[in-house]
């Protein structure tokens, strides 16, 4: 069971930060922090693909094969692709490739790439039903090594701006779920320091 740490009311619903295991949190749409091959080979991506069962790996392999026939990556940095959820507690999954800060070229442009990743997620969500509850781990964290303080601030800024925007995203509850103490502490600190700005 995930513990609720932060709750923020927005124009179109609510944003909550939870401490726990994302694979146990139910929602309409769940986000997987993917790599560009959609292979689920490391970190949270691997754990979530394992929890979804072999059907998801086969489905992602099919997407990869199809994209490679056109000489394209299955899902590039700053892109998103949706799939069925298989054994995860959601109706659909959105695989989003965030910046990998272990790579110098991506680290240099990490802020822009992270923003692009969230924008790709929001665009992909627009075509999914149901989507009232969105479950997501913070993008770019985990093995992709995005700096936690900066990542916490950007995650809050981007998601709250989206949920407070004039256009209704069709999402009523955003559940940001992390199991990393350091990221959670940074989220709490950033929220306390900037609550009036958010």
Regions found by a protein language model. Name each.
Residues 1-198:
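Macrodomain-like recognition of ADP-ribose-binding/processing modules
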